[in-house]
């Protein structure tokens, strides 16, 4: 087939440009070439360095790989682990190609300084406050948390002995938001329905906004994202949240002038005590509220839902757990602080649920700031995102659900090894709380909060699935959206108030 003749207009355009090029000084031409090289050469080098890593789903187009990631990254990580055993490989996400490293790389990655591997930490003040104020005072405030949990359960759970259907996700969010409000912001605002709605809505709206942005083309996001209705709702909720924070700051700034005023023990006051008053304290405290909502309310809600969804289909664990709980209570029915460590069967059940139904599939994520060479000689170029997949996703070690597996291992272990079987542990194989220097600072609060809520529910309620279905296969399946895995929303469970250990239905 003969080539088609060039359009005369195109020939004329080329001639004019060649003529202009002849008249352009050589220095300008060279400057232009250098500029183009400075723009495109780094991109070429980056792609060349990335191409050295094998690509999962290489036979598909980029768009098809994005679609596969969207419907379930969890399965891709498992396939990649089996195909590239112990090797690094590339995976196409919704945003970019990232490098997935084997678990064995974790030891050397932890030695890399922050200027090489970046963990974005814009909330260092909040983290510092949690470590210095919240965690050391947990023993002191645990009894207060228990009181708030009791009040919240009386409000949101049935008070009679008949089977009652509840919306698990809504109820879990109501309870955790209500209890946490007293610690996060305190005062009258903690009981303000408007503030509680803000904290609950922010959690929901963030998920909606994230999903809406993720399905938008990367290059269009700067233009379209601010116009998305989901993003607008999220920003409106944050503005309302800011107004509540402002109200509390102004009230406390006025009270501090009173020498008889005793500052409350809550996160808002601790942040104010550590704040630099020359800077924008309002914005800092609003950002802190956002972090606490995401880090505590959302994460704790997902964990509680996962545990209740599982308990409803494994009713054989209810009585042993209830017996352990009632045997640990004080004579007046209150929960002692020491129970947080004594709930061995509960601790084991929590850990087993997390192993079978993990909500975090990329527990280790870093952005490479400076080129980094692994011990096997593989070079990680600057700018690339690196992840390590949760071994619970890629490993089929725990195919059978055994709620007391870790309790039995703990009982059979030597004293020094017993902590390794606790739910609170964070190490190279268990990432539920993060890892190394970036382990979740609020894990001790979340740990205590969830155990107190669960203890009260199991102590006082029977739980089951609609239709009386049982068995782990009957459990509500988790929902996947790319690398986000979560419990399904708005699913019903049945609860029934039972006789308390004093022998009557309250």
Curated annotation (Swiss-Prot):
Kindly state a single biological-process term from the GO annotations of this entry: secondary metabolic process
Q: Enumerate the glycosylated residues.
A: 167, 201, 298, 427
The listed locations are: Membrane
Q: Give the UniProt entry's GO cellular component terms.
A: membrane
Q: What is its EC number?
A: 1.-.-.-
Please give one Pfam family short name. p450
> Which parts of the sequence bind heme?
440
Where do the TM regions start and end?
Answer: 26-46
**Metabolic or biological pathway, per its Swiss-Prot or TrEMBL entry:** Phytotoxin biosynthesis
Spell out the InterPro entries in the cross-references.
Cyt_P450, Cyt_P450_sf
Loss of function: phenotype: Impairs the production of tentoxin.
Q: Which family does it belong to?
A: Belongs to the cytochrome P450 family.
Q: State the function annotated in the UniProt record.
A: Cytochrome P450 monooxygenase; part of the gene cluster that mediates the biosynthesis of the phytotoxin tentoxin, an inhibitor the F1-ATPase activity of chloroplasts, resulting in chlorosis in sensitive plants. Tentoxin is a cyclic tetrapeptide that consists of four amino acid residues: glycine (Gly), alanine (Ala), leucine (Leu), and dehydrophenylalanine (DPhe). In addition, both the Ala and DPhe residues are N-methylated. The nonribosomal peptide synthetase TES assembles tentoxin from the four substrate amino acids.
Q: Per its record, how is this protein called by name?
A: Cytochrome P450 monooxygenase TES1
Instruction: Name the source organism.
Output: Alternaria alternata (Alternaria rot fungus)
Gene from which this protein is expressed: TES1
């Amino acid at each position: 087939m003969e080539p088609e003749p060039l359009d005369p207009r195109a020939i004329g355009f080329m001639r004019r440009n060649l003529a202009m090029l002849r008249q352009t000084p050589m220095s300008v031409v060279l400057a232009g070439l250098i500029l183009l090289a400075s723009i495109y050469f780094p991109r070429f080098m980056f792609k060349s360095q990335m191409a050295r890593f094998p690509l999962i789903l290489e036979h598909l187009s980029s768009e098809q790989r994005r679609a596969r990631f969207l419907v379930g990254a969890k399965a891709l990580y498992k396939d990649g682990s089996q195909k590239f055993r112990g090797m690094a490989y590339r995976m196409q996400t919704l945003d970019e190609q990232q490098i997935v490293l084997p678990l064995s790389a974790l030891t050397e990655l932890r030695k890399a300084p922050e200027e090489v591997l970046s963990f974005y930490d814009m909330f260092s003040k909040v983290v510092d406050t949690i470590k210095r104020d919240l965690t050391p005072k947990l023993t002191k405030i645990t009894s207060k948390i228990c009181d708030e949990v009791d009040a919240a359960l009386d409000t949101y759970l049935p008070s009679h002995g008949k089977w009652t259907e509840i919306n698990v996700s809504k109820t879990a969010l109501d309870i955790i938001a209500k209890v946490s409000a007293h610690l996060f912001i305190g005062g009258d605002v903690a009981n303000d329905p408007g503030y509680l709605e803000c904290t609950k809505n922010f959690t929901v709206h963030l998920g909606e906004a994230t999903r809406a942005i993720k399905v938008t083309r990367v290059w269009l996001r700067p233009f379209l994202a601010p116009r998305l209705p989901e993003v607008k709702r999220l920003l409106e909720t944050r503005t309302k949240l800011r107004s509540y924070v402002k109200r509390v700051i102004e009230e406390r700034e006025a009270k501090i002038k009173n020498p008889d005023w005793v500052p409350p023990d809550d996160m808002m006051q601790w942040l104010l005590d550590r704040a630099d008053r020359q800077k924008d304290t309002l914005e800092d405290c609003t950002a802190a509220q956002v972090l606490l909502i995401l880090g505590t309310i959302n994460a704790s809600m997902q964990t509680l839902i996962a545990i209740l969804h599982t308990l409803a289909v494994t009713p054989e664990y209810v009585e042993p757990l209830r017996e352990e709980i009632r045997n640990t209570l004080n004579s007046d029915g209150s929960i002692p602080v020491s129970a947080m460590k004594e709930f061995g069967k509960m601790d084991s059940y929590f850990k087993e649920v997390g192993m079978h139904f993990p909500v975090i599939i990329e527990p280790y994520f870093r952005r490479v700031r400076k080129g980094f060479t692994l011990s096997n000689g593989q070079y990680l170029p600057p700018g690339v995102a690196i992840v390590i997949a949760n071994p619970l996703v890629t490993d089929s070690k725990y195919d059978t659900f055994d709620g007391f597996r870790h309790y039995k291992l703990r009982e059979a272990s030597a004293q020094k090894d017993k902590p390794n079987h606790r739910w609170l542990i964070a190490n190279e194989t268990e990432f539920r709380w993060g890892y190394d220097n970036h382990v979740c600072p609020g894990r001790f609060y979340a740990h205590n909060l969830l155990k107190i809520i669960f203890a009260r529910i199991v102590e006082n309620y029977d739980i089951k699935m609609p239709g009386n279905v049982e068995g782990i296969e009957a459990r509500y399946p988790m929902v996947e959206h790319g690398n986000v895995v979560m419990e399904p929303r708005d699913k019903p469970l049945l609860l029934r108030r039972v006789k308390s250990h004093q022998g009557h239905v309250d």
